[in-house]
A protein has these predicted regions:
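Catalytic "initiation/cleavage/transfer" segments centered on a nucleophilic residue
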Residues: 91-98
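An amphipathic, aromatic/His-enriched active-site/gating alpha helix that lines ligand/cofactor pockets
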Residues: 26-39, 56-90
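Conserved beta-strand elements flanking the ATP-binding pocket of the protein kinase catalytic core
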Residues: 42
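Short, surface-exposed ligand-recognition loops at beta-strand->loop->(often short) alpha-helix junctions
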Residues: 11-22
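Short, histidine-centered active-site or binding-site loop motifs used for metal coordination
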Residues: 8-12, 57-58, 93
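Short, solvent-exposed polar/charged micro-motifs at secondary-structure junctions
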Residues: 51-55, 98
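Active-site-flanking beta-strand signature of metal-NTP-handling nucleotidyl enzymes
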Residues: 3-11, 52
């Protein structure tokens, strides 16, 4: 089965880290209910208030499928409120896993 990854980079203020970590699992569960192609997500703190949000998908067009249901988001919007200046770094197919 093919797997795809989308990576976003964002700034997270020090005071927003705990609320982000509390809401992110619930927001991802909400997103999975809306788009079962979302397999999971990882938050990575790379320092200097910069974080990566790595989303794993089962279909190449999963991001578009999820965004088509954006009006149904609740917790996803809350989570995005903690991710300042978020930008997509890239999206692609996983070609090797060791």
């Amino acid at each position: 089965m093919a797997e795809y990854v989308t990576v976003f980079r964002a700034k997270v203020a020090e005071g927003d880290v705990k609320p982000l970590l509390a809401v992110e699992p619930k927001a991802i569960a909400e997103a999975k209910r809306l788009c079962p192609e979302l397999l999971g997500a990882d938050l990575v703190n790379i320092g200097d208030s910069t974080w990566l949000h790595v989303l794993r998908w089962s279909a190449a067009d999963s991001v578009e499928r999820l965004m088509a249901r954006a009006e149904e988001f609740d917790l996803v919007h809350v989570m995005h409120g903690y991710l300042a200046d978020a930008e997509e770094v890239g999206h692609g197919e996983v070609v090797n896993r060791s």
